[in-house]
């Protein structure tokens, strides 16, 4: 049987399933769901026709109520419109879950542009060495940016994940329960999310999507392109803005930046802990049990015990895994070696930082900040800058800054923006001490 075109696969596996499960969603015994599901297509049709005729929104909405809901009060009108929004939000989630479940079938995962295709083309054209040379320098940086309107709350993300799994397994009973959960789960909190809340929501993607996907790509390159040869390039370098993006966001404070960095470190250690636990089920050989158990214990302590200090350094984690790897190769026929290599590759890619926390600030702010710092240094007689620094030309100021040495206490600065900007510089140093140099090295 020939493979269906992509559009047909999409229609069969996404569109048709959406129609079936949306019908199931309409039958759930919740207040107003059935009425909302019946009236929404009518409202959609009237909106489309009204838009084509260049009617304004008020005229379109009034026409709908005059035709289908003539006797309802104004409060009931608002209630129905609000239920339309709630219903559509959940339809979008349902569609996302179905699309995620069908992604590997709808899309050709080995087709043109994929890693496998590039590798095979290079081999066919005898250009494998050129591909290796290119990959030694090639790097991408997916950056998760801070846009609170563009992501779901954690509870909804969990439902999408579980719903996709249930759809893949055709588990109708579980799908029905998850749709019921979806109908009862609020999508928005009454309070506006803080920058830290935004960061936590995006860290969910790092923990549940990028962690596995990035390592899968990296493992493929090491195993199938380099095949045991030296390969020191991480290929994927994740970036992260929430908690560090001060450009236009007055709510991002130094405390939040430090808190987000700690959350990133805690999350990656948690992922390592899970992997080590899974590894212990496979690496059960003489000489490996004790060091693995010790790693698991100390990673657990680093996650759950109070305090910011980790009980196992990144270097120690990597060294211990390499020692275990050597034992498995030399004494145990390299059994489950790929699982050890998988964790080692993750440690190389993510360190203790997970993603690079970018500190961002409007460049125009820095002129003002420098002026405030120079004035405060003069007031405190620190002797860091020449007395006439502010009168110097830009070129002369640059020469001074190249040789300037000294330390300024941010708390002495009277200007709020200047103080917070300088605090963010010191915060970068603290983050690098805790999470490693790669954790926060871009301003």
Language model features by range: what are they?
Residues 1-399, 414-420, 439-442:
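Often metal-dependent polyanion-binding catalytic scaffolds in large enzymes
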Residues 403-404:
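Extended, compositionally biased accessory segments flanking or bridging domains
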């Amino acid at each position: 049987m020939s493979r269906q075109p992509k559009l047909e696969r999409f229609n069969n596996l996404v569109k048709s399933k959406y129609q079936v499960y949306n019908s199931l969603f309409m039958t759930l015994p919740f207040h107003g769901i059935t009425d909302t599901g019946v009236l929404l297509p009518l409202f959609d049709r009237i909106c489309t026709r009204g838009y084509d005729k260049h009617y304004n929104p008020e005229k379109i909405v009034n026409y709908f109520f005059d035709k289908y809901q003539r006797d309802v009060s104004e409060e009931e009108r608002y209630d129905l419109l609000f239920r339309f929004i709630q219903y559509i939000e959940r339809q979008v989630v349902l569609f996302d879950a179905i699309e995620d479940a069908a992604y590997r079938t709808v899309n050709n995962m080995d087709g043109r542009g994929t890693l496998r295709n590039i590798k095979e083309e290079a081999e066919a054209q005898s250009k494998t060495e050129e591909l290796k040379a290119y990959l030694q320098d090639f790097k991408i940086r997916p950056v998760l940016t801070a846009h609170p309107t563009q992501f779901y709350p954690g509870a909804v993300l969990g439902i999408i994940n579980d719903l996709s799994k249930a759809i893949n397994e055709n588990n109708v009973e579980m799908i029905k329960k998850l749709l019921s959960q979806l109908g009862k789960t609020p999508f928005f909190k009454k309070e506006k999310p803080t920058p830290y809340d935004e960061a936590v929501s995006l860290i969910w993607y790092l923990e549940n999507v990028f962690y596995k996907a990035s390592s899968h790509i990296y493992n493929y390159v090491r195993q199938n392109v380099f095949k045991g040869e030296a390969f020191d390039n991480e290929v994927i370098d994740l970036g992260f803005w929430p908690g560090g993006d001060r450009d236009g966001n007055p709510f991002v404070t130094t405390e939040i930046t430090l808190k987000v960095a700690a959350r990133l470190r805690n999350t990656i250690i948690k992922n390592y802990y899970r992997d080590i636990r899974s590894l212990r089920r496979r690496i059960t050989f003489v000489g490996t049990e004790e060091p693995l158990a010790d790693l698991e214990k100390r990673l657990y302590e680093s996650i759950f015990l109070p305090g910011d200090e980790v009980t196992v350094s990144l270097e120690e984690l990597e060294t211990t895994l390499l020692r275990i790897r050597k034992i498995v190769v030399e004494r145990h026929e390299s059994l489950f070696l790929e699982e050890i290599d998988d964790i080692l590759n993750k440690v190389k890619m993510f360190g203790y930082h997970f993603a690079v926390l970018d500190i961002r600030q409007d460049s125009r702010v820095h002129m003002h900040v420098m002026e405030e710092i120079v004035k405060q240094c003069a007031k405190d007689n620190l002797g860091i800058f020449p007395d006439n620094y502010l009168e110097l030309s830009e070129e002369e100021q640059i020469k001074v800054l190249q040789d300037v040495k000294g330390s300024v206490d941010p708390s002495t600065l009277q200007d709020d923006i200047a103080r917070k900007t300088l605090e963010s510089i010191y915060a970068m140093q603290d983050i690098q001490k805790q999470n490693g140099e790669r954790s926060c090295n871009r301003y």
